[in-house]
Amino acid sequence: MTKLGRFLGEHFKTVRLLNEDRVGVVAVTGRFVLLLACILSPKASAQTDHGTDYIRSSQPTLLIYTELVALSQQETVDPPLAAKLQTLLTTPFINNEAYFSGTKPLRPDVEGLGPSLRLVEWNIERGMELDDIKLAMTDKEGFLAKAHAEPNDKKKTMDKELIAQMDVFQSADVIVLNELDWGMKRTDYRAVVKELADALKMNWAYGIEFVEVDPKVLGLQSFANVKDEAERKELENLFSVEKNRVLGLHGTAILSRYPLRDVKLVPFKYQAYDWYNGEKKYGTVEAGKRKGASLLFGEEIVREVRRGGRTNLMATLDVPELPQGQVTIIATHLENRTTPKGRVQQATELLDMIRPIRNPLVIAGDMNTTGADGSVLNIKSAVVKKLNDPGWWATKGIKYATGVGLVMDLATFGFKTAKFQADPTASGVPLLAPNPEENFFDDLQKYRFDDGSRIDFRGDEKLSVNGRDGTLSNSNERAKKGFVTTFSLPRTLGEKGKFKLDWIFVKAYLTDDPKTVDSYRFAPAFARTMDDVNEALDEPLSDHAAISVDLPLSQQSH
């Protein structure tokens, strides 16, 4: 095999292809099962205390291969296909089979809190390591055995922490997940959300964020210009697909031991990046940025032509222990290909949408708080951006007059790395090192809902898993400096580039009145970052670490 083949083979993780039912068979079988359920059971749903039904199972109509090809090749498609795509991007998959099979919430009894709702959030990087993720979430002994059997095992001293983190996974009543594939070759055409939910015996909802239509994904990429015949055939084999198994779905999910109701899929009105036209037309400057990113971090960035955009998956849980008897879960994923200002706009849109909700709610997901401008640039916009940047003018004289520009660059990079990448909530230094994400967190902290409540930014030493206080430490684990980071990119030289990208924000009963009753009821506590589990095997489970929080169902005194 050529070097190119070995590189691509590892990058795309081409492994065995699991045999799964074809789309047509699934459709026919689904109709038969639905008909049988109606015959055997007069109701395929169950009544809730709120007078509504729990939907047993529903999903939108999926696209077939020829429709995916049309969506790839034609910017404007026929109205029926456009309508089908729109329905797919706004209609959630809902499955409460676990509830109908007897699954009930665990409500772990947490020391110092009592019975609690434990929530986990995790970007699982498409589900590339799905089998090991399932193992970590369901079989502690099996996962530890695999970790110790690996050639580079250095984990034996970490068993206690690994077990503690896996206990969190296995006792969670709600799991919010980003980046789940369904019908993609890179993940063996598997329905990642369904497999994981089945393994955990949990109800689930799935919202499509993108329909992947890049020519590479659909097996349409031509390699006729590759002169070496062996390499060309290898590429053609790597990018070939089984057309009857490709569904092209990529999205967000909520898994829950509580049954799910009032499930909604709401795309952002403000889409900061056009993943269809933008990926087809990136220009010279952007190509340079991509090369630079690869050089700095060793990150392989490839074109991703997609239909769809960033979205919000919302669901209501019936939690009778709380005054309103319900909790709203919002799973979100903010845009990475934009400026911090673009993410602020998306966050504001989300907050305004959920502002009327009076019961407790949790917002969880990959917020992409890199502090970086990941937007597509062209030469003109790059020049304009420089001219409008006061920080550039403040350092321009130093760079050109004294020759210490490199020192300034390194100092600025080090300051940002140590402070903002690990703690995007930190205050910046105007001109020298402003914090690009500062407005994001300021706006969240100042926001007030219609009932007078606010997002809980508290950091109590006694409610921290490691005894550290500070902004948001109750809901997101802090380190000695900043937060425990959740995302890493391997670099060619030195340590990994690490960032805090994934967040849990909780709105419960906290108001501006210090005498508010129940201000610690359902308030976040004992936040964890499960980075040890994520890194326990030679191949990380994801490029993101999972995070968790405990939410007490009764009032606590602190």
Q: PLM features: residue spans?
A:
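Catalytic-adjacent loop/helix segments of enzymes that bind and process anionic phosphate/sulfate esters
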Residues: 238-239, 246-250, 257-345
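N-terminal secretory signal peptides that target proteins for export/translocation
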Residues: 1-27
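Active-site environment of divalent metal-dependent phosphoester hydrolases
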Residues: 127-128, 182-185, 212-215, 273, ...
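Short coil/turn segments at beta-strand junctions that form active-site/ligand-binding loops
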Residues: 116, 171, 325-326, 358-360
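Bacterial N-terminal signal peptides
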Residues: 30-41
